[in-house]
Amino acid sequence: MQRCSVCNAVETLLVDTQITSRFLPLLAEALAGQCELRLDPTAREILGDDYPAATEEDWATEYNDTILAIRVVDGLEEALEHIRLYSTQHSEGIVTEDREEAERFLQLVDAAAVYHNASLRFTDGGVFGFGGELGISTQKLHARGPMGVEALVSYKYRVYGDGQIRSS
């Protein structure tokens, strides 16, 4: 875990039910002592009651801390619904070898940046080549995503003519 207080940190991890029994113990071991895991009931069945139970509030919280909420989902549809309900619309990602599922995720998730098999930490104005990041917008009007100076300016068009007209 690195830089948990930044806006592109991961707060919630959705794990497909098909891989939970193999993946969750490996994840818990890798993150032991590095962060607090808050688990849904299915994840707690696998990892044990020593971990705190995740609450409804956890799914919508940006912790800015070393906390990771984990929820087990039954397939892409359930993951998409969770994201639709709780996403900040900043950055969302999917880790999968299934390209069709990944493309579907990238198409259907409403976020300023969507990722397939890449770190969400790339959502950054400097990384995207915009220069120093001045902000990040999750709105759909005007700029969306990391913004540099260019995204914050508006344009004024000066049009000079010699009597030209526009035909219908």
Across the structure, where does each feature detected by a protein language model lie?
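Short helix-capping and hinge/turn segments at secondary-structure transitions, especially at repeat
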Residues: 1, 15, 32-36, 75, ...
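ALDH superfamily catalytic-core signature
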Residues: 1-65, 116
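Residue-level signal for secondary-structure boundary elements
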Residues: 4, 8, 35, 71, ...
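Short, well-ordered beta-strand elements within core beta-sheets of diverse protein domains
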Residues: 12-15, 65-74, 89-95
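C-terminal core of ALDH-fold dehydrogenases
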Residues: 26, 76, 81-167
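Active-site pocket-lining segment
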Residues: 59-74, 78-85
